[in-house]
């Protein structure tokens, strides 16, 4: 430090005993400096030897500027408006204004478009103090104007700012503030020697080599930054700390200022202590919340729709709630939540639900949703009130057939009136099955592009209703022509429970939320193109040993099973030839099947291949598209349902391709419970409201399978190629089929006059001999010419198929003797 002060004294003035250097000589030396004048060197630096200066190249002459006192004493300009017309930007000070002019407007010293980089050929500018006798005169100028101004304000300007503790005065407010930080303090060395300033203490330490105290190690600027940082931290922590922590007084405020020598604590120690205190006292700002609670009971104001992997809660058009997709994995842990746009949710029916709750007794592991299993949800929706919204087009409900949903299981006590404006739904005690629509075939082994899985949870104490429609083409505006759509409604009453055998599929009704294996899938397929091949799968019915029974003691009435086409939704396609076959399971049915099917092995999940011997070998080439039919003899014998096999003919004049290659497009109805007080369904002519409808196995059978070279058509030939589901009900069943078609959609052909209505009534008794299996009376017999209109070569099967279709015999042997 002494050497530095001596060097500063040498540079300020000639030391005693050293010859003074004339100003001209110093100016010449400055001019001969290779980089910059010696006056601009750092304080205490040694001058370069004369030999080095002489050998270096001569730089360009410097430009010395001596500002006036008025310029130096002028106050610093703030909030300066840009001088360029139209700019309007306000700069905080003059240097910022100059930088703005150069960077934004390319203006510098009145020159348009100057280069940003300084020209190295220009002479450097230096600024000297204008006060005579000042050591920072022309011999020791400053390299910047701000430096000479700072020097002038500190050394020569009027000292207007006085300290309140002492008599010192300062020319600038900043100097006074810096002085007040150390005014009255004593800086003591570790040896005990006190000093009035930190600078004097540092000089002492440099001379003696003593250890600097910890409180004086950091410079004042760093201390100020640390103190401001700590102050900001305290202000932010006060917002989160409890009131008890805020009441604690600060340690530095409690300390008295009386002693002249103030021992300061270590800055690092104080920082660490404050950090520790903050970490302990400050609670987390945002406590962690679980993404989804454990779904024991959920109240949802949204209708329910399910895609293949996860269930979807879709809002209505008027609802402002966000749709939520809830996924549940196998380990009973809630998965992720996805947001679904409302355009996707427009596929579901518009339902206004009161509450959606999961059963508390249902384990969460039973709500898993595998793609290959038919049952994958346990969502139960209770709908309270009906909607009075006007009837909308079905096309607005279903945007595209590519948006698919499958494997839906619901227990709906009410539904929207969008689909049935002409009749109100039942009371809150009724149950409604939801609709499903998909473009993927999961459980069919024929060339069908569409498969629907619909399962209905039906309490035994409720009369249930079902909307079970597979839709490929609602209207021409929404779908491509050529699709076939059919909606059926069914009602049937089970009047006795004393003699009834436990119904196999009732396990779905009682234990749908308790056992995954007690359910079965229900595919319903509609053929659109013979080139589309869908995936196949096998599904069976639940075992017969399920102890729960659907039947209840109800007064015996004539139940009606109604099938009718929905002509209002399909103006371009007419559905005809509705055939109903009802088979009740008897104890010796297995023997009959075994005798009629000697060449067919009936195992669990067995499939009938295309290469079966017998009538299949003589099929024409046009019927080769038929694949195997899923047939399970054990589930076939243990099932309890009424299976409806429907052949439908597309009589549209626009369709010229033989679409009647494959028949038995739809398989409808399981066990039906009806109520005499049910109101008719809005879209069906002369049909009762749906009771309980459980879709069963899908079958699609080529009519050529009914052909045989032998003059006789055995019952096994029918059952082998059709997936019949047997019924063991003790109640009498009456089946009525109505297929009314508007005359405007039918071509003016004689052979199609009789196609306008086909009505078949079938009476069957569960525990009577097998001879009464087909007791059928036909009120209207469909002519065989309607099958010839589809360009199918069925000339050899007219008599055989008409016999199968009408079934006018009173005994079973009459069917097999054709």
UniProtKB/Swiss-Prot annotation:
Compartment(s): Nucleus
Record GO biological process: DNA damage response; motile cilium assembly; positive regulation of DNA-templated transcription; positive regulation of gene expression; positive regulation of non-motile cilium assembly; positive regulation of transcription by RNA polymerase II
UniProt feature, compositional bias: Low complexity: 1-34
Gene3D superfamilies linked: Classic Zinc Finger
Region: Disordered, residue numbers: 1-62, 210-284, 603-625
Pfam families: C2H2_ASCIZ (PF24757), C2H2_ASCIZ_4th (PF24761), C2HC_ASCIZ (PF24759)
Ranges of Basic and acidic residues composition bias in the record: 210-221
Biased composition (Polar residues): 229-243, 603-612
PROSITE patterns reported in the protein's UniProt record: ZINC_FINGER_C2H2_1
Zinc fingers classed as C2H2-type: ranges: 80-105, 161-181
GO cellular component terms, semicolon-separated: nuclear body
Entry-linked InterPro entries: ATMIN, C2H2_ASCIZ_1st_2nd, Znf_C2H2_ASCIZ_4th, Znf_C2H2_type, Znf_C2HC_ASCIZ_3rd
Domain of life: Eukaryota
UniProt entry tagged with the keyword Metal-binding: yes
Binding partners and assembly: Interacts via its C-terminus with ATM. Interacts with DYNLL; this interaction inhibits ATMIN transcriptional activity and hence may play a role in a feedback loop whereby DYNLL1 inhibits transactivation of its own promoter by ATMIN. ATMIN.
Entry function: Transcription factor. Plays a crucial role in cell survival and RAD51 foci formation in response to methylating DNA damage. Involved in regulating the activity of ATM in the absence of DNA damage. May play a role in stabilizing ATM. Binds to the DYNLL1 promoter and activates its transcription.
Full protein name: ATM interactor
Species this protein is from: Mus musculus (Mouse)
């Amino acid at each position: 430090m002494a050497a530095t002060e001596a060097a500063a004294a040498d540079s300020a003035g000639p030391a005693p005993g050293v010859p003074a250097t004339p100003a001209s000589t110093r100016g010449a030396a400055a001019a001969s400096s290779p980089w910059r004048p010696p006056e601009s060197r750092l304080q205490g630096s040694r001058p370069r030897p004369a030999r080095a200066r002489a050998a270096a190249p001569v730089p360009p002459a410097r430009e010395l500027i001596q500002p006036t006192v008025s310029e130096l004493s002028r106050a610093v300009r703030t909030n300066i408006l840009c001088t360029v017309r139209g700019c309007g930007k306000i700069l905080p000070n003059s240097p910022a204004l100059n930088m703005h002019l150069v960077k934004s407007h390319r203006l510098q010293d009145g020159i348009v478009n100057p280069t940003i980089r300084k020209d190295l050929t220009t002479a450097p500018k230096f600024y000297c103090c204008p006060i005579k006798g000042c050591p920072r005169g022309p011999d020791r100028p400053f390299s910047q104007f701000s430096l000479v101004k700072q020097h002038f304000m500190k050394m020569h300007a009027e000292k207007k700012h006085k300290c309140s503790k002492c008599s010192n005065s300062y020319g600038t407010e900043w100097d006074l503030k810096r002085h007040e930080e150390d005014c009255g303090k004593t800086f003591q060395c570790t040896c005990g020697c006190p000093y009035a300033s930190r600078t004097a203490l540092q000089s002492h330490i440099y001379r003696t080599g003593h250890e600097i105290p910890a409180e004086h190690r950091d410079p004042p600027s760093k201390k100020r930054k640390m103190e401001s940082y700590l102050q900001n931290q305290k202000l932010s922590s006060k917002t989160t700390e409890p009131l008890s922590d805020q009441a604690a007084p600060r340690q530095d405020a409690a300390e008295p200022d009386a002693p002249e020598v103030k021992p300061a604590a270590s800055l690092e120690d104080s920082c660490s202590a404050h950090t520790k205190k903050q970490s302990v006292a400050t609670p987390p700002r945002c406590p962690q919340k679980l993404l989804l609670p454990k779904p024991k009971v959920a109240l949802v104001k949204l209708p329910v729709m399910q895609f293949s992997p996860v269930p979807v809660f879709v809002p209505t058009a008027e609802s402002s709630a966000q749709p939520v997709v809830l996924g549940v994995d196998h380990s009973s842990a809630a998965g992720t939540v996805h947001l679904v746009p409302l355009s996707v949710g427009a596929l579901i029916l518009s339902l206004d639900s009161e509450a959606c709750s999961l059963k508390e007794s249902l384990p969460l592991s039973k709500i898993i949703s595998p793609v290959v299993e038919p049952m994958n949800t346990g969502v139960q929706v209770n709908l309270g009130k009906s909607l009075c919204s006007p009837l909308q087009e079905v096309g607005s409900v279903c945007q595209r057939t590519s948006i698919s949903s499958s494997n839906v299981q619901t227990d709906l006590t009410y539904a929207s009136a969008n689909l049935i404006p002409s009749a109100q739904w039942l009371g809150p005690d009724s149950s409604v099955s939801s609709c499903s629509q998909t473009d993927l075939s999961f459980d069919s082994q024929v060339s069908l592009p569409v498969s629907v899985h619909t399962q209905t949870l039906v309490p035994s104490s409720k009369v249930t209703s079902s909307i079970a429609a597979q839709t490929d083409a609602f209207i021409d505006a929404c779908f491509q022509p050529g699709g076939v759509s059919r909606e059926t409604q069914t009602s049937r009453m089970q009047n006795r429970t004393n003699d009834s055998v436990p119904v196999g599929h009732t396990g779905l009704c009682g234990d749908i939320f308790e056992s995954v294996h007690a359910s079965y899938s229900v595919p319903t397929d509609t053929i659109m193109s013979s080139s589309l091949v869908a995936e196949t799968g096998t599904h069976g019915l639940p075992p017969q040993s399920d102890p729960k029974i659907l039947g209840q003691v109800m007064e015996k009435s004539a139940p009606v099973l109604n099938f009718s086409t929905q002509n209002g939704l399909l103006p371009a396609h007419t559905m005809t030839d509705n055939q109903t076959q009802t088979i009740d399971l008897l104890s010796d049915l297995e023997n009959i099947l075994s005798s009629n099917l000697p060449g067919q092995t009936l195992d669990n999940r067995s499939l009938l291949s295309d290469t079966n011997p017998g009538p299949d070998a003589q099929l024409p080439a046009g019927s080769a598209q038929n694949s195997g039919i899923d047939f399970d003899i054990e589930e076939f014998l243990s099932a309890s349902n009424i299976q409806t096999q429907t052949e439908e003919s597309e009589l549209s004049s626009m369709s010229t391709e033989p679409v009647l290659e494959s028949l038995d497009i739809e398989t409808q109805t399981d066990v039906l419970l009806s109520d005499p007080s049910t109101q008719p369904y809005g879209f069906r002519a002369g049909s009762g409201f749906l009771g309980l409808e459980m879709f069963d196995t899908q079958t699609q059978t080529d009519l050529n399978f009914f052909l045989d070279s032998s003059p006789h058509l055995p019952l096994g030939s029918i059952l082998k190629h059709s997936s019949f589901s047997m019924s063991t009900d003790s109640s009498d069943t009456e089946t009525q089929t109505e297929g009314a078609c508007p005359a405007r959609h039918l071509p003016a052909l004689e052979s199609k006059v009789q196609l306008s209505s086909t009505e078949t009534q079938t009476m069957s008794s569960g525990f009577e001999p097998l001879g009464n299996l087909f007791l059928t009376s036909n009120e209207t017999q469909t002519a065989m010419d309607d099958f010839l209109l589809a360009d199918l070569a069925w000339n050899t099967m007219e008599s055989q198929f008409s016999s199968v279709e009408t079934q006018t015999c009173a005994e079973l042997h009459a069917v097999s003797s054709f």
